[in-house]
Amino acid sequence: MHLRIDTIEHTLTAAGLGPGPTGYLVAYALAEDNLRLGHSIVADSVNSLAITRQAWRDTAIRAGAVILEVELECSDVDEHRRRVEARTPDWPGQRLPAWAGVTGRVIEPWDRPPFRVDTAGRTTAECANLVVQRWPAAACWLPRHPAEHRT
């Protein structure tokens, strides 16, 4: 299941609720419900804050699921800028970040290393394939039951 924070936040805004933590809280609840049903979840978000990363981990732990934390990065600054500036809205009125907003965003440090994928020179399919190849290994580094988890 693909959970895209942009879509959830857009829907909440259209319903008269402004942006804020509500979109993430809805995503955590949907993720936990679906993880408990045995579904895999792809949580699509910027996830620049340590508190949101921990909330995703906690969601997986409560559901007894494994988690693979993935960070996408583009090491080619020119390519990254081209992608940001060429992006088109997915719905009318969608406000996309400008390059200055992307480069000015504060990314809090990770407290444990994610699986990093450098998207420079790669297609979306190639990047997705790298994640899929890594997924089976995730079960080796996160327990399936909350009682086994140590932070």
Task: Cite the ranges covered by each PLM segment.
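Conserved substrate/cofactor phosphate-moiety recognition/catalytic segment
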Residues: 1-39
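Conserved nucleotide-binding/hydrolysis micro-motifs of P-loop NTPases
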Residues: 7-9, 48, 73-79, 121-124
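Structural recognition of the conserved hydrophobic beta-strand(s) that form the central parallel beta-sheet
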Residues: 41-45
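Conserved phosphate-donor/acceptor-positioning beta-strand/loop module used by diverse small-molecule
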Residues: 61-84, 117
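Small-molecule kinase domains that catalyze NTP-dependent phosphoryl transfer to phosphate-bearing small molecules
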Residues: 86-130, 136-151
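Hydrophobic alpha-helical packing elements
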Residues: 23, 52, 80, 123-127, ...
